[in-house]
Regions:
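Terminal recognition/anchoring or ligand-binding modules at protein termini
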Residues: 133-138, 147-148, 166-168
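Ser/Thr-rich, low-complexity intrinsically disordered terminal regions
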Residues: 67-73, 128-138
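Short helix/turn-capping signatures at newly exposed starts of structured segments
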Residues: 27-122, 163-168
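Short, hydrophobic/proline-enriched secondary-structure or compact coil segments at domain edges
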Residues: 154-164
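Bacterial N-terminal signal peptides that target proteins for export
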Residues: 4-16
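Bacterial N-terminal signal peptides
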Residues: 16-25
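Short Gly/Thr-rich strand-loop-strand
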Residues: 115-135
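Short, exposed beta-strand-loop hairpins at the edges of beta-sheets
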Residues: 144-154
Length: 168
């Protein structure tokens, strides 16, 4: 009797463990977006949102003497500047890679950005001054990723998130 009870407990425990592992695998496989462009969230940090008060910025995002903030995104070192509107609200965020990135690295960065927002970055045609550039739009906000140099090869990448201008 004791042996049967012990086997049932082990079997129940095994079933529970298998269910838990399945849940972990299933949630790990879903492509959860980390940031919502529709809400103005910034890909660099869950604490940054367009329209938030510049006075309420977390300490790590406060620019000292207007110098860029150094951080990392997708494994690439970036220099970030934040811009406020007249009301003191965060209007735009610009991140520039500190190193020249190869076209493969640029594509890797683009894919990571697309995954973080769960939106495609659409290639922009007819932009001769910036031949490798992509846009993403949602909910009145835009992400613009392009090369700093006007070439198709290696170069510094600029990623800017901002509110789209409204028609007057």
């Amino acid at each position: 009797m004791f042996l049967i009870s012990k086997m049932k407990k082990k079997r129940s425990l095994l079933v529970v463990m298998m269910l838990a592992i399945s849940m972990i695998i299933m949630t790990g496989c879903t492509n959860k977006k980390a940031y919502s462009l529709e809400k103005g969230e910034i890909f660099l940090s869950p604490t940054l949102t367009l329209g938030m008060s510049m006075e309420g910025l977390p300490e790590e995002w406060v620019q000292v003497r207007n110098l860029p903030i150094r951080t990392e995104y997708a494994g690439f070192p970036m220099e970030v500047t934040l811009e406020a509107d007249e009301a003191g609200k965060l209007r735009s965020v610009k991140a520039i890679s500190q190193d020249e990135l190869t076209t493969d690295q640029q594509d890797e960065l683009r894919k990571t950005l697309s995954q973080d927002y769960d939106l495609p970055l659409t290639a922009v045609q007819n932009r001769e001054e910036q031949p490798r550039s992509w846009l993403m739009d949602e909910g009145g906000y835009r992400v613009d990723m392009s090369l700093l140099a006007s070439s198709y090869g290696d170069g510094e990448v600029v990623i800017e998130v901002y509110a789209q201008p409204t028609a007057k």
